[in-house]
């Protein structure tokens, strides 16, 4: 049909629909122009409401396009032409709109993008580079913002949050490659919230032929590096440098290189092996093949450049650097060895997709180009898009002159130099287009010799200068040398003087592999009806004729015409045929890439859908049990378990299970378990056994943690197992794809072999994922029986210790349980010791207070216990209205340990003071001998004076000042009396009162814990402050009854003994601290059943 349409001028269905719609839009324009800005903006919400009511996009298309045209005129000052509206309608119909260069494709895109963004599902505009992405988003974004729609820009190396925002906008502008990479990365995340893309709804591709045709052969690959020995690449590179032209053969058409017999012999000698093509040397053959291609096929400044000591690939169609791209399968490393730059690790494919399969996932796909009609059949076959040619707004005035052909490249370059020099002297601007960077360097040197000022634009220049260089290419006297990247997507506007001199002259120096590329270069001139001229200079030594025509025969025939132009029509026909031949070859190559990718596409879709299910599902229990069923079925199905008769050998089965899986599922199988079981019931029996083991695993896991933790654990196991095995599967498929062509020699279809083998490999992948997932779950320590019993977990002390425990994510749950249990036991043991000390203290009775039991002193207002005061005992019930956090907010664990450690010391000192006091109350006899102290006496017989002196000495060792704040707390603490003394406070007589008052000045008090007093600091301050006041009277008394020499000796002895005792207590306290590690910050110790003294 397309063939007859070309000659009969039959319009396509899309074109007929578009022309009718254009008439209705023009009729609506006279009503829309009367709307105010506010009314025009409100149309957006009006259209959205219509869609919610059930209207379809095609139902509101005419009015939406009329509104978009008016908004464009008001914001940009440019009213879209009818041909631009016509092109926009064709785009909305899902076809390719071919619009000649300079016809305003960017403005054409506004209306269809606006219409499809109204659905709220997002509209994406794909461009060929980041410069056009930013330019179009900024310029066209003004119109969309005016109409109330948001616009986002997506670029490489952006933060994921910024990418997520860009995709969430109503309209997103992005480079085409980044769209594919974001899709692959989204299917590698561990949580749905990490994804950046949303539904692939609508995509408009600018320069659609460049993306869907020219770059379709190169798949998008996300790879990870693997550390390889770089010496192997250098070794292969050195060998290739020793070869002569007779040692290898090069196929120019397929760019394949093979060793001849002499080359193989040299390889055997160089690597000191017997047979290069022995299976054990297959890796070496692979290295040599890559080194040969790097040296004999891939050329610097053609396929790649060296920039900043790195290999940068060059796009053969645009001349631009393909940033972030590299060759796979070791070819990149071979080129790096050739150019003597740093060899990067060879990569392993982690995820891959082709442009064809990615863009076919959009609900609606359309595109614009200046040259797409020649590839219409490919657009129809692969993308189901028809190419419709949009008429120009003004007739084309450019002259396309016939090609000039020369016998040699030297003659061609001389003719190009003379023509450029002539045009420069005339003042007519000229754009010299080259197919390769190498060619642009040649003409650059020629023009330097001729003293012609010029500008060079190729992949070696900064991209930021591209727009500026192209903008100046149309002024009078401008000479610009550029690769095929020149002006792609940009506008060259000739000056008024240049138009008077004939407009822009486009001079091509080589025929491209596709007629589309040549037409794109011609289209730089003659935009919007401007005058201009285009012409190609070609030779019989150009790459096109050498690869796809019988150029040797042509060279022999036309050798006599060296130095002059060849005007043979048959030769021009040969060039055109060579272009068609290479176009067909490239189409077959793209079709083959798509066919092979279609095989893995089905597998990829299934894996990615299952992966998304894991990310959003909570039914991990069901998934695991299904995998157990697959796991058991595969185990039992192994043929080694069967006898020759076909019946199962249960002993072999049990031996196999115990050898391969018992260590993972923590269960030893016994042949007795399988007695009286029919072969048909074997799978169900083993499945039941494994499920019972799993149920026990699950019960143990729940005892250790909660269901949410278990679900997350299963999720991570399943995701990691799926991802790891999918990566391995992709690499296996890549190797299969590389080697499958060898089956052609056995008269087999490579594609069919790839499909069959790939299907088997995928089935193995599913089984492997299930097998490994089940074993990983069973082998996890999470299912082991918990070390911490339910009784311990219910203990408030354990709950307090657990709340302050810092979990280490790098340790297993069992190891963390051991640490937590050890800490709990240490804390419990220590607190039990403290409680025992408190009980012993309560059992001690003061002799002086025995007479006070029957007449307790009534409590005063300051002494009575307030509603916020509380003594913590094992039976205490805490009022929930009391802020217990305030009690302990300043407690330091060091204070807690010091207080508990010194309790016994303080008790002994109190006892000694009581004995001293009792001695003082008895009548004294003036016997000097009684004041002397025998140094050899046991400590039990030391006199009361010496004990008093010891107390005074200990107190005087480390005098400490009490701050004002602590003194205030001390005053409050003094008002609080121990509970066991409250019933003994009122003496029966004045003498008893005086005795008690004297005792109170000597004996340190232990305050009760209140909400106003921080117990650790109060106890410490109370004891130290009172210790400073106690010794004064005693020191004086000792001086009166003891000689100085004896007192001095006693001081030395007492100090030495106390120092040793203090050191021992310090060591004991440090050991305890080392066992119990608490956070350094202040903690809330809710000790509900412990009394602290």
UniProtKB/Swiss-Prot annotation:
Family annotation (CDD domains): DEXDc_SecA (cd17928), SF2_C_secA (cd18803)
Record field: catalytic activity: ATP + H2O + cellular proteinSide 1 = ADP + phosphate + cellular proteinSide 2
The UniProt record lists the keyword Transmembrane: no
Compartment(s): Cell membrane; Cytoplasm
Binding site for ATP: 84, 102-106, 491
Keywords: ATP-binding, Cell membrane, Cytoplasm, Membrane, Nucleotide-binding, Protein transport, Translocase, Translocation, Transport
Primary location class: membrane
Regions of compositional bias (Basic and acidic residues) in chain numbering: 904-937, 944-971, 978-1062
Organism: Mycoplasmopsis synoviae (strain 53) (Mycoplasma synoviae)
Sequence similarity: Belongs to the SecA family.
E.C. designation(s): 7.4.2.8
Listed PANTHER family: CHLOROPLAST PROTEIN-TRANSPORTING ATPASE, SECA INNER MEMBRANE COMPONENT OF SEC PROTEIN SECRETION SYSTEM
A Pfam family the protein falls into: SecA_SW
Example of a GO biological process term: protein transport by the Sec complex
Disordered: annotated segments: 837-869, 904-1062
Subunit structure: Monomer and homodimer. Part of the essential Sec protein translocation apparatus which comprises SecA, SecYEG and auxiliary proteins SecDF. Other proteins may also be involved.
Membrane topology: Peripheral membrane protein
Name the record gives this protein: Protein translocase subunit SecA
Domain of life: Bacteria
Any one annotated GO CC term: cell envelope Sec protein transport complex
């Amino acid at each position: 049909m397309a063939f007859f349409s070309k000659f009969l001028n039959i319009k396509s269905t899309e074109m007929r629909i578009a022309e009718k719609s254009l008439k209705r839009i023009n009729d609506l324009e006279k009503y829309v122009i009367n709307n105010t800005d506010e009314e025009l903006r409100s149309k957006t919400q009006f259209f959205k409401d219509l869609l919610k009511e059930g209207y379809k996009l095609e139902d509101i298309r005419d009015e939406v396009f009329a509104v978009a045209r008016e908004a464009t005129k008001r914001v940009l000052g440019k009213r879209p032409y009818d041909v631009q509206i016509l092109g926009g309608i064709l785009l909305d119909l899902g076809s390719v709109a071919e619009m000649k260069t300079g016809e305003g494709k960017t403005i054409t895109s506004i209306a269809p993008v606006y219409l499809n963004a109204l659905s709220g599902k997002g509209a994406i505009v794909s461009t060929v580079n980041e410069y056009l992405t930013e330019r179009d988003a900024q310029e066209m974004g003004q119109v969309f913002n005016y109409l109330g729609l948001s616009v986002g820009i997506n670029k490489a190396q952006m933060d994921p949050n910024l990418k997520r925002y860009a995709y969430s906008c109503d309209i997103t502008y992005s480079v085409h490659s980044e769209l594919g990479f974001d899709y692959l990365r989204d299917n590698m995340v561990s949580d749905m919230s990490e994804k950046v893309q949303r539904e692939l709804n609508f995509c408009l591709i600018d320069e659609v032929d460049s993306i869907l045709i020219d770059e379709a052969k190169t798949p998008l690959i996300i790879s990870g590096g693997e550390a390889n020995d770089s010496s192997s690449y250098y070794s292969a590179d050195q060998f290739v440098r020793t070869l002569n032209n007779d040692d290898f053969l090069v196929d120019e058409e397929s760019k394949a290189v093979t060793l001849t017999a002499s080359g193989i012999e040299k390889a055997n000698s160089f690597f000191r092996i017997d047979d290069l093509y022995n299976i054990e040397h297959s890796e070496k053959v692979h290295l040599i093949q890559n080194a040969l291609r790097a040296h004999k096929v891939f050329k610097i400044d053609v396929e790649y450049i060296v920039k900043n000591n790195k290999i940068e690939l060059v796009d053969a169609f645009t001349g631009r650097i393909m940033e972030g791209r590299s060759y796979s399968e070791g070819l990149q490393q071979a080129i790096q060895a050739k150019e003597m730059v740093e060899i990067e690790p060879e990569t392993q494919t982690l995820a891959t997709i082709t442009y064809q399969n990615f863009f076919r996932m959009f609900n609606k796909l359309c595109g614009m180009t200046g040259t797409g009609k020649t590839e219409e059949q490919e657009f129809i076959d692969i993308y189901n898009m028809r190419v419709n040619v949009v008429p120009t707004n003004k007739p084309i005035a450019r002259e396309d002159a016939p090609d000039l052909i020369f016998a040699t490249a030297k003659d061609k370059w001389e003719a190009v130099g003379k023509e450029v020099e002539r045009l420069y002297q005339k003042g007519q601007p000229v754009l010299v287009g080259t197919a390769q960077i190498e060619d642009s360097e040649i003409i650059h040197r020629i023009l330097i010799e001729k003293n012609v000022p010029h500008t060079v634009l190729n992949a070696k220049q900064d991209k930021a200068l591209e727009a500026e260089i192209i903008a100046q290419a149309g002024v009078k006297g401008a000479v610009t040398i550029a690769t095929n990247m020149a002006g792609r997507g940009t506008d060259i506007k000739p000056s008024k003087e240049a138009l008077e001199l004939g407009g822009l002259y486009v001079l091509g120096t080589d025929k491209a592999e596709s007629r589309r590329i040549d037409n794109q270069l011609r289209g730089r001139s003659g935009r919007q009806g401007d005058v201009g001229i285009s012409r190609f200079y070609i030779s019989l030594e150009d790459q096109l004729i050498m690869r796809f025509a019988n150029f040797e025969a042509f060279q022999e025939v036309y050798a006599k015409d060296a130095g002059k132009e060849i005007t043979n029509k048959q030769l021009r026909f040969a060039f055109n045929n060579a272009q068609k031949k290479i176009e067909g070859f490239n189409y077959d190559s793209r079709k083959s890439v798509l066919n092979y990718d279609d095989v893995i596409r089905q597998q990829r879709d299934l894996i990615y859908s299952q992966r998304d299910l894991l990310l959003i599902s909570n039914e991990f229990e069901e998934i695991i049990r299904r995998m157990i069923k697959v796991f058991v079925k595969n185990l039992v199905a192994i043929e080694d378990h069967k006898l020759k008769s076909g019946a199962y050998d249960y002993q072999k089965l049990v031996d196999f299970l115990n050898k391969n899986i018992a260590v993972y599922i923590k269960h030893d199988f016994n042949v007795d378990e399988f007695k009286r079981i029919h072969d048909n019931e074997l799978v169900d029996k083993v499945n039941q056994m494994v499920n019972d083991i799993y149920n026990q695993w699950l019960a143990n896991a729940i005892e250790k943690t909660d269901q949410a933790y278990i679900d997350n654990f299963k999720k991570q196991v399943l995701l990691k197992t799926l991802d790891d095995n999918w990566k391995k599967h992709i690499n296996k498929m890549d190797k299969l794809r590389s080697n499958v062509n060898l089956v052609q020699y056995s008269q087999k279809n490579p594609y069919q072999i790839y499909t069959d083998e790939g299907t088997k490999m995928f089935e193995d992948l599913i089984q492997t994922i299930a097998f490994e997932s089940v074993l990983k779950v069973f082998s996890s320590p999470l299912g082991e029986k918990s070390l911490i019993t339910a009784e311990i977990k219910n203990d408030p002390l354990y709950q307090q210790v657990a709340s302050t425990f810092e979990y280490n994510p790098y340790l297993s749950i069992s190891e963390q349980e051991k640490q937590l249990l050890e800490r709990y036991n240490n804390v419990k043991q220590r607190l039990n010791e403290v409680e025992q000390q408190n009980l012993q203290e309560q059992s001690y009775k003061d002799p002086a207070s025995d007479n006070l039991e029957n007449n307790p002193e009534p409590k005063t207002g300051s002494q009575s216990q307030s509603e916020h005061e509380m003594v913590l005992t094992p039976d205490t019930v805490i009022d929930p209205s009391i802020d217990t956090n305030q009690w302990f907010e300043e407690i330091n664990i060091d204070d807690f340990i010091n207080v508990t450690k010194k309790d016994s010391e303080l008790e002994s000192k109190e006892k000694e003071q009581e004995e001293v006091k009792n001695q003082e109350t008895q009548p004294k006899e003036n016997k000097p001998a009684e004041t002397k102290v025998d140094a050899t006496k046991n400590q039990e017989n030391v006199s009361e004076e010496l004990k008093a002196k010891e107390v005074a000495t200990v107190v005087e060792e480390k005098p400490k000042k009490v701050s004002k704040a602590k003194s205030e707390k001390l005053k409050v603490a003094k008002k609080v009396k121990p509970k066991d003394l409250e019933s003994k406070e009122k003496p029966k007589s004045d003498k008893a009162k005086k005795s008690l008052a004297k005792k109170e000045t000597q004996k340190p008090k232990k305050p009760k814990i209140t909400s106003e007093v921080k117990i650790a600091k109060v106890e410490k301050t109370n004891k130290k402050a009172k210790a400073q006041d106690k010794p004064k009277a005693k020191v004086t008394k000792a001086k009166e009854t003891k000689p100085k020499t004896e007192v001095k000796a006693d001081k030395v002895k007492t100090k030495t003994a106390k120092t040793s005792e203090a050191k021992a207590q310090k060591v004991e306290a440090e050991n305890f601290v080392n066992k119990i590690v608490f956070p350094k910050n202040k903690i809330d110790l809710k000790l509900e059943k412990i009394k602290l003294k």
